[in-house]
Regions:
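PLP-dependent amino-acid enzyme catalytic core
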Residues: 1-416
Length: 416
């Protein structure tokens, strides 16, 4: 298990390599939650993610012989960028395995940072499948595997985020009640928690997971890491089916509690951060800020620091994020409604069912021959989310057999 001293040693190596990212007071969030909120902006790191820290330090610690043979890694994106950047700087070969579901923006960034020293292999639908292929390749080629989280040197490198936070807080004359840390495989929180509990043991360390990928919560509940059969890959940077053995043992010892944050709330937060203060975060990076909403009643008057772990957001995903945010906020809803197959039925629906400022966002209709009614897939955006119950009452009067797709996970997921 790593110690705070290991993190100090890692910082000596990394201080001339990585950016000492900003620790900024956030006036908007502070006023919103009645607290003093600071943001550690790892989205401003050289590869727009904290992952450079662990990757660089782990590779730096290899022997010259191991460096010459080359390294292998598996990553959903950010760890791969850290490895690629490092190998380009050190002029050593790297083979990087990425899930086929990885956003194109992250794949392109890996190529950019790695240049001629990196070969990319897209394998598997999840990180875990990609990691298994990478492990097999490592053995067959006699190279060194750089684990994205379950490695003590990687954890020590990630822990330098906490080293900087504590150092910057002292310079500002600030002390924190709690620190909110995104959790995927556990590399960041294991490093952060190790250092924080050594230098500021009274500070609460809170891990934040996406609700659809709570692998650390599952490990806490079972007493050991377990593999989740299915995960929501929306927050891809923290969507991990199974946490590491080494990261779990550190988290179990030092992390005070874990929170789950709905992917819709993450989307809403990500959009809010961009529109209000111009901060660009990826879903995983926004998770810690989203968690403020979950604990808003208990943080009033307190001083909190949130780590924005990354800012590698694919602009092509914004429509999905907007959709998730609207659904989470209770604005957008989907239904299957049987419409009378006669002229004027749609006008009647709009006049009788929708409020004056409500909107139809989706309308798919297939006319049925020789039938009095035909099913319509309809999306409705409410002007006031509090009118939801009234909408359901009016829908029931229009079609008692209507289907609310919010209760049908399979169909609902096809739309979002």
């Amino acid at each position: 298990m790593i110690t705070a001293n290991d993190i100090v040693k890692a910082n000596e190596v990394l201080k001339n390599v990585v950016e000492r990212t900003q620790l900024d007071f956030d006036r908007y969030l502070s006023e919103k939650y009645g607290a003093t909120i600071y943001i550690k902006k790892e989205n401003m790191q050289k590869v727009r993610s904290f992952k450079l820290r662990g990757a660089y330090y782990a590779i730096h610690q290899l022997s010259d012989e191991d460096k010459a043979r080359g390294v292998v890694c598996a990553s959903a994106g950010n760890h791969a960028q850290g490895v690629a950047y490092t190998c380009n700087e050190m002029k050593i070969p790297a083979t990087i395995f990425m899930p086929v579901t990885t956003p194109l923006q992250k794949i392109g960034q890996v190529r950019f940072f790695g240049g001629k020293f990196v070969t990319i292999k897209l394998v598997g639908d999840t990180f875990d499948a990609s990691a298994q292929a990478a492990q097999e390749y490592t053995k067959s080629e006699g190279m060194t595997f750089i684990d994205p989280f379950d490695d003590y040197n990687v954890q020590a490198g990630q822990g330098t985020v906490a080293y900087e936070i504590y150092e910057q807080a002292q310079e500002e004359g600030v002390s924190f009640d709690s620190i909110l840390v995104p959790v995927g495989g556990g590399g960041l929180i294991s490093g952060v928690a190790t250092y924080i509990k050594d230098v500021a043991p009274s500070m609460e360390v809170i891990g934040v997971e996406a609700s659809g990928a709570r692998s650390m919560r599952a490990a806490f509940d079972r007493g050991y890491p377990v593999k989740l059969e299915e995960i929501d890959k929306f927050a891809d940077g923290i969507a991990v089916q199974k946490v590491g053995v080494k990261t779990y043992e550190v988290a179990r010892k030092y992390v005070d509690r874990l929170l789950g944050v709905d992917e819709g709330l993450i989307s809403e937060t990500l959009i809010d951060m961009y529109s209000k203060v111009g901060t660009i975060a990826e879903p995983a990076g926004a998770a810690s800020v989203a968690a403020l909403e979950v604990i808003k009643d208990e943080i009033k008057g307190k001083t909190i620091v949130c780590i924005i772990s990354g800012g590698n957001n694919d602009i092509n995903r914004m429509p999905e994020m907007e959709e998730r945010a609207l659904i989470y906020d209770g604005i957008k809803h989907y239904f299957v409604v049987n419409f009378p197959q006669r002229p004027g039925a749609l006008r009647e629906f709009v006049n009788d069912i929708l409020g004056p400022n409500d909107d139809i966002t989706r309308f798919e209709y297939i006319k049925r021959a020789n039938k009095g009614k035909g099913p319509v897939l309809i999306g409705i955006a409410l002007s006031d989310k509090n009118d939801y119950d009234g909408l359901l009452e009016r829908l029931s009067a229009f079609d008692p057999s209507y289907i609310n797709l919010h209760g049908n996970e399979t169909l609902y997921n096809m739309l979002v």
